[in-house]
């Protein structure tokens, strides 16, 4: 409840998605002004297609997702990605146990993977932003 997102939800519309149907867990967030979207469950997680349907019904037709590798994989797997932003910085990170941008099982072959076309390159001092749009 201490996060800035929750604290400002009366001024800035804030939607929280969950597959938890226990309304007593929702009410503290609702008291701060958050709107709760209860989705179907898929493999113990939010059903992303159901969430997208609910967001569309309230007029939200695009999202900027800064997710971890698991969420990124789930969105790709469900064909819910049409644009990717990839930032490259001037520092080298990594290691054998480092998380990657896309986790999950991955695609078996390049033909199974969605294809993206480079649409923009921007430089910010020592960093680069690559933007890709899905090829349909």
Language model segments and positions:
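Enzymes that bind and transform nitrogen-containing heteroaromatic metabolites
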Residues: 1-136
